[in-house]
C-alpha cells in the first residue's frame, strides 16, 4: 500500500488579484502563506518518502512549508529534471539515504495561458466576452491564444505522472505532489478515471490536500480531502 498526496499551492498574489497566472513565476500572497502553513499542520504527522513539484515558486514554497513542519522529514535534496541522463548521478552516503528527494519538473507546471497571462479575468471578459473566456478556462480542448488547452496540459502532466510517480507508488512509497490547479486536475482525471467534462467542472481549492491510498496495481482504495 502507498499514499499519494496531491496539493495545489496556496493562494498566489495573482490569484488574489484575479489574474491569469500560468507560467508567470509569482509568489504566494500572505493568505497563501497561511494556507500553506495550515496544510502543513494537517500533514505534519504524514510520512513522505519523496516529493515532486513544478519549476514555479508558488508550488515550491508551499511544498517547503509542508516539509518544514513535517515531523518525519528532517532534510531533503532537490533534483532538477533537466532531461539529461546525468541529472541524478551522485553517490549517496548512508546519511544522505535518509534525505527526502524533491524532484522538480516543468511538466508539472500550471497550464500555459499564453496571451491571457497577467490579464485580470474580469478585464478579459470585457475584452472577449463571458462565453469566450469561459470556453478558454473550462473547455478541455480549446486553448487560449498562444496558450495550452487543458488537454495539452494533461498530456505532459500525465506522462510525467506515469513515468516518474507511478513507479514510486508501486514500490510502496508515500509520495507528495505539490503543483497547480490544472496539472493536478489532469492527474486526478487520470487516476479517478473521470471524463473530460467531469474534470473541466472539477474545482481544486488552494492548499487542500487530496490523499489517495492505492495498491501496486494503482487501484484507488480510498480518498480523503482535507479542508
From Swiss-Prot:
Alphabetical GO biological process terms: gluconeogenesis; glycolytic process
Keywords: Gluconeogenesis, Glycolysis, Isomerase
Pathway: Carbohydrate degradation; glycolysis; pyruvate from D-glyceraldehyde 3-phosphate: step 3/5
CDD domains (UniProt xref): HP_PGM_like (cd07067)
Active site, per annotation: 9 (tele-phosphohistidine intermediate), 110 (proton donor/acceptor)
GO molecular function: phosphoglycerate mutase activity
Reaction it catalyzes: (2R)-2-phosphoglycerate = (2R)-3-phosphoglycerate
Site note Transition state stabilizer, residues: 180
Binding, substrate: 8-15, 21-22, 58, 110-113, 121, 137-138, 181-182
PROSITE patterns: PG_MUTASE
Annotated SUPFAM superfamilies: Phosphoglycerate mutase-like (SSF53254)
Enzyme Commission code(s) on record: 5.4.2.11
HAMAP family, per database record: PGAM_GpmA (MF_01039)
Subunit structure and binding partners: Homodimer.
Family: Belongs to the phosphoglycerate mutase family. BPG-dependent PGAM subfamily.
Function text: Catalyzes the interconversion of 2-phosphoglycerate and 3-phosphoglycerate.
Name of the protein: 2,3-bisphosphoglycerate-dependent phosphoglycerate mutase
Amino acid at each position: 500500500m502507498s499514499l499519494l498526496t496531491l496539493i495545489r499551492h496556496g493562494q498566489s498574489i495573482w490569484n488574489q488579484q484575479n489574474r491569469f497566472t500560468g507560467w508567470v513565476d509569482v509568489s504566494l500572497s500572505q493568505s497563501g502563506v497561511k494556507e500553506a502553513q495550515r496544510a502543513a499542520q494537517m500533514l505534519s504527522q504524514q510520512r513522505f518518502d519523496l516529493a515532486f513539484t513544478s519549476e514555479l515558486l508558488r508550488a515550491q514554497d508551499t511544498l517547503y512549508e509542508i516539509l518544514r513542519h513535517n515531523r518525519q522529514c528532517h532534510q531533503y535534496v532537490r533534483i532538477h529534471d533537466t532531461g539529461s541522463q546525468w541529472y541524478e548521478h551522485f553517490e549517496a552516503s548512508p546519511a544522505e539515504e535518509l534525505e527526502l528527494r524533491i524532484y522538480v519538473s516543468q511538466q508539472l507546471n500550471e497550464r500555459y495561458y499564453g496571451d491571457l497571462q497577467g490579464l485580470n479575468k474580469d478585464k478579459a471578459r470585457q475584452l472577449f466576452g463571458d462565453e469566450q473566456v469561459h470556453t478558454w478556462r473550462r473547455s478541455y480542448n480549446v486553448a487560449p491564444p498562444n496558450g495550452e488547452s487543458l488537454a495539452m496540459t494533461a498530456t505532459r502532466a500525465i506522462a510525467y505522472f506515469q513515468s516518474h510517480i507511478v513507479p514510486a507508488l508501486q514500490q510502496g512509497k508515500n509520495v507528495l505532489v505539490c503543483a497547480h490547479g490544472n496539472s493536478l486536475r489532469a492527474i486526478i482525471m487520470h487516476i479517478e478515471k473521470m471524463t473530460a467534462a467531469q474534470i473541466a467542472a472539477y474545482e481544486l481549492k488552494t492548499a487542500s490536500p487530496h490523499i489517495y491510498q492505492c495498491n501496486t496495481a494503482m487501484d484507488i482504495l480510498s480518498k480523503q480531502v482535507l479542508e
